[in-house]
């Protein structure tokens, strides 16, 4: 991710909005926004397979009982507007097929 380019573009955006990016209170804003975007969009650099491998903490089981995982924090951004669209907690249940 090109955080320097993001900083430059945020600086230009502030100018386009009629703000003075050099005024006190905004001087560090381009850098802060670039850092925030690097954190929020970090996942786009990985494939689904790579993410599954990172969290590959599964083990074999011999059961047909439902597994429930509660209160999973989930958020997502709209790719068209780059705005936070979902910020929620979810719960899932599944019947394992040999692995949990």
Q: How would you label these PLM feature ranges?
A:
Residues 1-87:
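Active-site loop/lid in soluble adenylation, ligation, and acyl-transfer enzymes
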Residues 88-100:
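Extended, low-hydrophobicity, polar/charged segments
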């Amino acid at each position: 991710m090109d955080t320097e380019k993001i900083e430059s573009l945020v600086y230009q955006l502030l100018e386009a909005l009629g703000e003075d990016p050099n005024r006190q209170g905004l001087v560090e804003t381009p850098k802060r926004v670039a850092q925030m975007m690097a954190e929020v969009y970090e996942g786009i650099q990985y494939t689904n397979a790579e993410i599954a491998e990172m969290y590959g903490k599964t083990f074999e089981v011999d059961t047909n009982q439902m597994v429930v995982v509660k209160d999973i924090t989930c958020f997502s951004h709209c790719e068209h507007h780059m705005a936070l669209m979902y910020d929620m907690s979810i719960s899932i249940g599944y019947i394992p097929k040999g692995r949990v």
